[in-house]
A protein has these predicted regions:
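A structural microfeature
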Residues: 66, 131-132, 214, 244, ...
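A mid-sequence, solvent-exposed acidic-amphipathic segment
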Residues: 171-215
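Conserved donor-binding loop and adjoining core beta-sheet/short helix segment
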Residues: 6, 11, 24-100, 208, ...
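Conserved active-site tyrosine of GNAT-family acetyltransferases
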Residues: 120-122, 271-272, 276
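Conserved acetyl-CoA-binding loop-helix of GNAT-fold acetyltransferases
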Residues: 86-98, 234-236, 240-257, 272-273
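Short amphipathic alpha-helix that is part of the acyltransferase structural core
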Residues: 1-40, 133, 147-182
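Acyl-donor-binding surface of acyltransferase catalytic domains
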Residues: 71-151, 282-287
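Conserved hydrophobic beta-strand within the GNAT/NAT acetyltransferase core sheet
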Residues: 107-111, 229, 262-267
Length: 287
């Protein structure tokens, strides 16, 4: 091995890091997050990108073998590690503690349950698990079928950007906390121009008045046969009607013929009702 490291350069490293994540992907995230996880964040306005120079890449000659990075918040640190390079785990944990962002001295390490070498390194360095949860994944070997309730329909392509924005504003609780949506759609430009965007697969459900009331984004990742769903939301007054389940069934219908074998979900018990199974153990470590 000829191991070297340097800091992440956002303007030139993204595609190589994306390819690295494609190469090491496993369904239980034993080697780290899937590639669209980071691209979605970097393309979104909610991620603070002012500290990405703190992220670090390790190489074996010219091959990327490890990455330490943050997403949101900046104090949550993630680890991607190529199989065969577990010897770097302790160095990665030490770097995270020493150099990755902290606020008021606080920081968390996000280590997935299947990341055994990193878990052992964190324990050895005095970190302890604060809490965790299981993210659910839908196996496409089992058909996913849900019908839209009466009074709703799938929006025609291309989707209306403004309607998507307003749906997400309401669906993620911003209207209740900050007031009505202000009409700004500019922030969507980063997502629309992301290098691996597959927004043409996104699903929106509208009511009889033509308002979007449920939205499901799709980052189709053919190299991993992964249907990476992000985001998913329903406007509060239209919840508990089966809209999100119908949106996911439509994503299944659109991506399975492309070769998708599974779709990511989340930790909410709602996913259990649509046939998702716990697959990815999230664990948050503190000192």
């Amino acid at each position: 091995m000829n191991i070297t490291h340097r800091q992440y350069r956002i303007l030139s490293d993204h595609i190589a890091v994306y390819q690295f994540m494609l190469e090491i992907y496993e369904c239980d995230w034993r080697n780290g997050v899937p590639a669209p996880f980071l691209e979605y964040a970097l393309s979104s306005d909610w991620m603070d990108k002012s500290l990405v120079h703190r992220n670090r890449i390790w190489f074996d000659d010219d091959k990327i073998v490890a990455l330490v990075f943050y997403e949101n918040p900046v104090t949550d640190v993630y680890f991607s590690l190529r199989p065969g390079y577990e010897c770097l785990a302790e160095e990665m944990i030490a770097y995270a503690e020493t150099c990755m962002p902290k606020k008021e001295g606080k920081q968390r390490l996000v280590i997935f349950g299947a990341q055994k070498a990193l878990t052992a390194a964190a324990q050895k360095a005095g970190w302890h698990k604060e809490f965790g949860y299981w993210e659910k994944v839908r196996d496409f070997a089992v058909p996913l079928e849900r019908k839209l309730p009466k009074g709703y329909r799938f929006a025609s392509a291309p989707l209306d950007v403004a309607k998507c924005c307003e749906c997400c504003w309401k669906g993620f609780g911003h209207e209740a906390e900050e007031g009505p949506w202000d009409g700004d759609t500019e922030y969507t430009g980063g997502l629309a121009t992301a290098p691996h965007s597959t927004a043409h697969l996104d699903v929106a459900i509208e009511n009889e008045d033509g308002e979007y009331v449920c939205y499901a984004g799709m980052w189709w990742t053919p190299e991993n046969k992964l249907a990476y769903m992000e985001p998913l939301c329903t406007v509060p007054e239209h919840r508990r009607k089966g809209l999100a389940a119908a949106a996911m069934a439509e994503l299944y219908r659109r991506t399975k013929p492309l070769g998708a074998t599974h779709m990511t979900g989340g930790g909410d018990p709602f996913y259990d009702k649509v046939g998702f199974k716990p697959e990815i153990e999230w664990a948050f470590w503190v000192k």
